[in-house]
A protein has these predicted regions:
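Hydrophobic ligand-binding cavity/cleft-lining segments
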Residues: 1-39, 151-152
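Hydrophobic-ligand-binding modules of eukaryotic lipid transfer/binding families
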Residues: 1-8, 86, 95, 132, ...
Length: 152
């Protein structure tokens, strides 16, 4: 299973990056049912609708630029998100590749029929939550002399 994406958000790169820095941060986006620290950077992330947690570890973190991770346990695979800031927004591009361990040649069939749409929906949920965050921020004020100051 391979999921690729390219999404733009009118949010600061630091804010968006904070949702992806470690697997423990993913619960803020994906409606996970909890996260457990397994030590050495590994986390078991419970996912709604899945019988087994996603056991993941960030393998490369460049703050504000890149996050790469790997899976182990029931799932095997990896993923990556690249962050490209521009004035007023950030572009996220990347992929997640995963498979069910122990199904061998049946894994692609099971992934296509049972898992891929669920994983896509999970990513879409995260994107919706970030877009909702954009809307909740509203217009920013700089605090300069043109701003109204009722205390003055």
């Amino acid at each position: 299973m391979l999921i690729t994406f390219s999404e733009r958000f009118a949010l600061p790169v630091e804010e968006v990056f904070s949702y992806f820095a470690t697997p423990a941060d993913w619960v803020r986006l994906y409606g996970s049912v909890g996260v457990r620290d397994l030590g050495s950077g590994w986390y078991a992330v419970g996912i709604k609708g899945f019988p087994f947690p996603l056991v993941a570890k960030s393998t490369l973190v460049e703050p504000g630029r890149l996050v790469r991770w790997t899976f182990r346990g029931f799932w095997r695979g990896e993923g990556e998100i690249r962050f490209t800031p521009s004035p007023g927004s950030v572009l996220l591009e990347g992929y997640e590749r995963g498979a069910v361990r122990w199904l061998f040649f049946l894994s692609p069939i099971a992934e296509r029929l049972l898992l891929e749409s669920r994983f896509r929906k999970m990513w879409e949920l995260g994107w919706r939550r970030l877009h909702k965050r954009e809307l909740s921020r509203g217009p920013e004020t700089s605090g300069d002399a043109t701003s109204e100051n009722p205390a003055a």
